[in-house]
A protein has these predicted regions:
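Polar, S/T/G-rich
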Residues: 1-191
Length: 191
């Protein structure tokens, strides 16, 4: 009887882990310079691994982050979310909508699809103390995010950055073409 009561007490005091859908893990940014390469098929909203962080400027005014989305070229990065708010970017990557744009140009996000001929991000190269022209990220899809410190804008810390992406291009034996597809059979065949 004592074992039964002890077992019941432990179960009652142990927090339960929500089972939820598998998608919940995709909407996070883990900090890891050695994260495994992820394959992305079809269209999905996802976060990524923060594989690079650097602070620059007087009193570390700017925070530079690389958020790796996939270990291959993506067909496209359609939209960007800060926390759960979809944002619009201008031609230079600065956020121009929502609360993230109210106090000036505090957030810049640049999209990199991971093409085989991808070159280093010119803004990151110019503003970083550590990045060289060898940092191309060829074959790696990522977001380069620069935050300008503002206590009012970032009162709750670094926000969550996610993107709606179109995944890996896959071969179709029926047409002998390699294109983006959300056809499950073609994606499984590619994997």
């Amino acid at each position: 009887a004592a074992t039964l009561v002890t077992s019941w007490a432990l179960n009652a005091l142990t927090p339960s882990i929500p089972s939820g859908s598998g998608m919940q893990g995709l909407l996070a940014n883990a900090r890891s310079p050695l994260a495994p390469h992820e394959y992305v098929y079809g269209q999905v909203r996802k976060g990524g691994a923060n594989t690079y962080l650097e602070a620059t400027g007087d009193e570390n005014k700017f925070l530079h982050m690389i958020i790796t989305l996939a270990g291959h070229e993506l067909d496209g990065i359609d939209s960007i979310y800060i926390n759960d708010e979809i944002v619009t970017l201008d031609g230079n990557g600065f956020v121009t909508t929502g609360g993230w744009a109210e106090n000036g140009l505090k957030v810049r996000i640049k999209k990199h699809l991971g093409a085989a001929n991808q070159t280093v991000d010119t803004d990151l190269l110019a503003e970083s103390n550590l990045i060289t022209s060898d940092f191309k990220g060829q074959g790696i899809a990522y977001l380069y995010v620069r935050l300008e410190y503002d206590q009012d804008v970032f009162a709750n810390g670094i926000p969550l950055f996610t993107a709606m992406v179109r995944g890996k291009k896959v071969g179709d034996p029926r047409t002998a073409q390699v294109n983006y597809s959300n056809n499950a059979a073609l994606c499984i065949r590619d994997y």
